[in-house]
Structures are given as C-alpha cells and as structure tokens.
Amino acid sequence: MKNIRNFSIIAHIDHGKSTLSDRFIQVCNGLSEREMKEQVLDSMDIERERGITIKAQSVTLDYTARDGQTYQLNFIDTPGHVDFSYEVSRSLAACEGALLVVDAAQGVEAQTVANCYTAIEQNLEVIPILNKIDLPSAEPDRVAQEIEEIIGIDATGATTCSAKIGIGVEDVLETIVAKVPAPEGDVNAKLQALIIDSWFDNYLGVVSLVRVKNGTIKKGEKFKVMSTGVAYQVDRLGVFTPKMKDLDHLKAGEVGFIVAGIKDIHGAPVGDTLTHAHNPTDKPVPGFKKVQPQVYAGMFTISSDNYPDFREALEKLSLNDASLFFEPEVSQALGFGFRCGFLGMLHMEIIQERLEREYNLDLITSAPTVVYKAIKKDGEIIEVDNLSKLPEPGAIAEIQEPIVRANILVPKDYVGSVITICIEKRGVQVDLNYVGNQVSITYDLPMIEVVSDFFDTLKSVTKGYGSLDYELIRYEPANMVCLDVLINGDKVDALASIVHKDQAKYKGRELVERLKELIPRQMFEVAIQAAIGGTIVARSTVKALRKNVLAKCYGGDVSRKKKLLEKQKEGKKRMKNIGSVEIPQEAFLSVLKKIKL
C-alpha cells in the first residue's frame, strides 16, 4: 500500500488538465502510441467539442520512479466548471492529494479557488503545478505569488511544466510520488468501498467506479450495497489503464471498477458503500453531501410517442449524473414531460445535448426558474420550483427569492464594467480586494439573475478573462410577480414566468412583441397579452387574413357589396369565438431560448 498514490487534478477550464493527463498516460505507457489521441479521458463528444471535462474518469498507471521503485498512480480526472462542482467533490473524496494546475500565463481563476478550498476542507495535500511555461507570456513567479496570496498555500519552488510539449512531466510525477501521502486502510479489515461513479452499459449492466477504503474484494465474491441491503456477485473487476483491465481482486487503497450484472439503474447509487454480504461492516464510508438542484426547467419531447424512451434516457443519465433530479409534469401547451432540476445553466445545456445526441430525442425546454419561497398569510411556507405551485396572489404574504454570494476574479482593467453589470442585476457589493493584477469582487446577487445569462455577460465584458464562482447563502423577500401570457384570452402555461415587478412591464412587452412575429396570421384577429394577475401590462395583435369577398361583384349595387362584407364580419366574429390558435413549436423554442428572466 505504501506505493499507491491516489490523486486528482484541480484546474480551471483550458488550463491544460486533460493534456497533462494525456502526458501521464504516455510517460507510464498506459496506451500504445497508436491508441493515443488528444484528451483521452474526455470520452464524450460534447467534452471534446466544448473543450471541457464533464464526467469524472479514472486511470491507474504504473510509474517507475527515479528511486527505482514502481508506484501505482490512481488518477481521478475532475471537471473544472462551476456547475460540475459535485463531480469534483466526489472525485476528491477518493484521493489523498490534489494537483493544483494553474496556467502560468493566465493565473488563478475563481472556480479553481473554490475547488481548491473543497480539497483543503477534505484534508488533501494540495500541490501547486505551473503549466504552459513554454508560452512567451508565461510569468511563473507572478502566478506563484498569486497562488500564495489568493489561495494561501506555499507555492515557492512549485513544479513547472508544459504538458503540450512534454517538458517537466516526469518532474510532476516525481512530485506526486514524493508529496502525496500513501492511502491509509487495512487490507485485512472488513470491506468498505466507496462508489465514486456509476454508469450504465448495455452489455454489462451497471459499472461502478469504487475506491476501496478497507479490506479486499475478489472476483466471484458476494457484496451488498449498504443503503439498499441488496446483495450481488462480482462478475468482473479491475482498473482502467484507461482501457478496462481485468484483475482478480482490488485491495484497500486502490481505485477500480466492479461489474456485478446489476440491471436496476438505481442498484448502486453514487456515494454509497459496498461491503461483504457474509461479513459486513457496521458503518458506511462518510460519502459526500447530497447536492440540491439550483435551477429547474420543464423538458418535453416534441412527439409524445417518445415519452417512454425519454423516461428511460433520464433514468440512465441520472445514474451517471447524481445531481440530476426529475419528476413527471404535464403542460397544457406542451403535453407530457418532466420537471428537471440542474446545478446551473451549463449543466442544463449539457443534459439536453446528451439526451438529444445519445438517445436521439427532440426536446423543448421551458424557461428555467429557481426555487422561490412563497409565504402565505396563514404562515405556511411553500417552495415554488414550478409556477403551478404558486398560490393565488391574494393568499401570498410575501415571496422570497434565493440570493447567492458570487466571487468574481477579473483583471483590474475590467473592474468598472463588472460592477456595472452587477448593479444592473440587482447586486449588493460585499467586498473588493486587489491581489497583484487581479481583483477579487464579492457580490450578493439574486440567483435568477446569475443562472440566466450572467456568466455570458461577464465573459463578454471581461474579454473572457473574468471567472465566477457562486454559492447559495440565504433567501430574502423580493417584489416578485407572476407574468402570464394570454393568447385570445387563454393562458399559455409554458410561457409564464416569475419576474421582478420593476422589470415586469419591459419583459412583458418584449415577450409579446416576439410572439407577434412568430405566430402565423389566422383567418381571425389574434390578441397576445402579458398580464400580472388581472392587470394587462402589454398587448399586441396579429391582424387577420382577409379574403376578398367582393372579387365576384362586377359593378352592381352597393348594398350587395355591403351585405357580403357584413356576412364576412359575422363569420370572422364567430370564428374568433370558436377558433383556436395553433402556436408553432418554433415559436415556443424561439421564445423560451430568449426568455432571460
């Protein structure tokens, strides 16, 4: 066990984490040259295209160090984006050390700081590594000082490398061997294995990635999942090199996979503990905190025939992504679907994209919303993650909205424009510190403003240099109202949203004007209205198409023409009463994409 090293890499998007892991695999001969490709561990197409890591992956490599000994390095890859922080905490729970990889040209970013604190809280040894030192703009000394000032860990003598051209990679591996502590645990104790990740394989059933804390698990043995108490037999176990490599056993300190023919998707929940069926341990491994969804949206299939496939796809995804929440929902406008909970907007986009790509579904997503608290006059508190749960306006004493504390790191040239967008988003400044060339700005902002388009706006005003990390801190009363959309007097539930009263008229007008462009003209007039309660705040009309009923009258008496026109008018009136307006799917999609709450 003394030669095992479990570690993960903490790094911001684009700081070279995936490239560095490729180099580790190359140096340790994990794959042949022919099998090597860039970003080996980013196995999803979306990960490659967007250049981000979404899922945690693991690799076991044998490294012969300069002292002549062979070490088993278990490297657990982690995502860098703020929406996937849950994946990060899962990966860190299985490690003893973490490499803090920082781009020597760009410096420290906000999400790196947040993930680094998570690692420190879990008592991991954090080792700073300065990457991309081959760039002409690299300033390793300045960045090392930034690490010390912002994060507070000693970065003097930090290992430098360039993963892209392969300089210093062996030095990094030597640093891991020297500084990451060996795992603690007893090979002969009762089995305790923590499930770090699970995914569904069509041939093997559920595949679980586990970190064995104590004891040994062998092929053919029976184990049970502690939360459910169900026992299974091990069919295959082994490690990823990054290909699957079968072994006879996994012992304390090791990280590997277990296949036990589990067909039930919820058979091995992430964060659970496995133990022997015949000689179980009493207490599970302390897992990681259950994450609460922050953003909710309705998801519907365009054709209702795909509903069963949609449910199955969501179940398979939720096995692989423990932070996804869903429950059935019915919308009058969009039919049957699911109300889904996500960690943030990027998480929502990725889930939608994965459902569409991996499961060939066509989906519509309703406007995202956060969880509000409605306090009724009788004192009852209702958590509103869906507008249908909002009580009647007369019964509500106040609505409270979630407030997040956002920590923003930007170069000092952009401070003014960042403060401007924070004020526009109803933010309250808490703190502002200058650290070297960077400025750390802390604001309390309404969560709905942050999850809609704050990140994109921040990136554009800071030319891509701004970074953001946020966490929910409290609820506070706010003047929120429910904005309904009526078409010919009928409410369209899919387009309703909760907005701040000051912005309601502007949002209502914008929504109505956009719908006017998208709803095709009918044979009768279509009135589009935005309303708060019983008050109409905006209105627009799609004019009726008109058939020329006088075309067959050549000259002749004017009363004949009047009679035909009156008849047409009557017909239109009757049509308006009984005619229903078909709203095309494109109109929904276009409006929902643009609703920036």
UniProtKB/Swiss-Prot annotation:
<dbReference type="GO" id="GO:0003924">
    <property type="term" value="F:GTPase activity"/>
</dbReference>
<dbReference type="InterPro" id="IPR031157">
    <property type="entry name" value="G_TR_CS"/>
</dbReference>
<dbReference type="InterPro" id="IPR035647">
    <property type="entry name" value="EFG_III/V"/>
</dbReference>
<dbReference type="GO" id="GO:0005525">
    <property type="term" value="F:GTP binding"/>
</dbReference>
<keyword id="KW-0378">Hydrolase</keyword>
<keyword id="KW-0547">Nucleotide-binding</keyword>
<dbReference type="GO" id="GO:0043022">
    <property type="term" value="F:ribosome binding"/>
</dbReference>
<dbReference type="InterPro" id="IPR005225">
    <property type="entry name" value="Small_GTP-bd"/>
</dbReference>
<dbReference type="GO" id="GO:0097216">
    <property type="term" value="F:guanosine tetraphosphate binding"/>
</dbReference>
<dbReference type="InterPro" id="IPR035654">
    <property type="entry name" value="LepA_IV"/>
</dbReference>
<dbReference type="Pfam" id="PF03144">
    <property type="entry name" value="GTP_EFTU_D2"/>
</dbReference>
<dbReference type="InterPro" id="IPR004161">
    <property type="entry name" value="EFTu-like_2"/>
</dbReference>
<dbReference type="InterPro" id="IPR006297">
    <property type="entry name" value="EF-4"/>
</dbReference>
<dbReference type="Pfam" id="PF00009">
    <property type="entry name" value="GTP_EFTU"/>
</dbReference>
<dbReference type="GO" id="GO:0003746">
    <property type="term" value="F:translation elongation factor activity"/>
</dbReference>
<dbReference type="Pfam" id="PF06421">
    <property type="entry name" value="LepA_C"/>
</dbReference>
<dbReference type="GO" id="GO:0005886">
    <property type="term" value="C:plasma membrane"/>
</dbReference>
<feature type="binding site">
    <location>
        <begin position="14"/>
        <end position="19"/>
    </location>
    <ligand>
        <name>GTP</name>
    </ligand>
</feature>
<dbReference type="InterPro" id="IPR000640">
    <property type="entry name" value="EFG_V-like"/>
</dbReference>
<dbReference type="Pfam" id="PF00679">
    <property type="entry name" value="EFG_C"/>
</dbReference>
<feature type="binding site">
    <location>
        <begin position="131"/>
        <end position="134"/>
    </location>
    <ligand>
        <name>GTP</name>
    </ligand>
</feature>
<dbReference type="GO" id="GO:0045727">
    <property type="term" value="P:positive regulation of translation"/>
</dbReference>
<keyword id="KW-0648">Protein biosynthesis</keyword>
<dbReference type="InterPro" id="IPR027417">
    <property type="entry name" value="P-loop_NTPase"/>
</dbReference>
<dbReference type="InterPro" id="IPR013842">
    <property type="entry name" value="LepA_CTD"/>
</dbReference>
<keyword id="KW-0342">GTP-binding</keyword>
<comment type="function">
    <text>Required for accurate and efficient protein synthesis under certain stress conditions. May act as a fidelity factor of the translation reaction, by catalyzing a one-codon backward translocation of tRNAs on improperly translocated ribosomes. Back-translocation proceeds from a post-translocation (POST) complex to a pre-translocation (PRE) complex, thus giving elongation factor G a second chance to translocate the tRNAs correctly. Binds to ribosomes in a GTP-dependent manner.</text>
</comment>
<comment type="similarity">
    <text>Belongs to the TRAFAC class translation factor GTPase superfamily. Classic translation factor GTPase family. LepA subfamily.</text>
</comment>
<dbReference type="InterPro" id="IPR038363">
    <property type="entry name" value="LepA_C_sf"/>
</dbReference>
<feature type="domain" description="tr-type G">
    <location>
        <begin position="2"/>
        <end position="184"/>
    </location>
</feature>
<keyword id="KW-0472">Membrane</keyword>
<keyword id="KW-0997">Cell inner membrane</keyword>
<dbReference type="InterPro" id="IPR000795">
    <property type="entry name" value="T_Tr_GTP-bd_dom"/>
</dbReference>
<keyword id="KW-1003">Cell membrane</keyword>
<protein>
    <recommendedName>
        <fullName>Elongation factor 4</fullName>
        <ecNumber>3.6.5.n1</ecNumber>
    </recommendedName>
</protein>
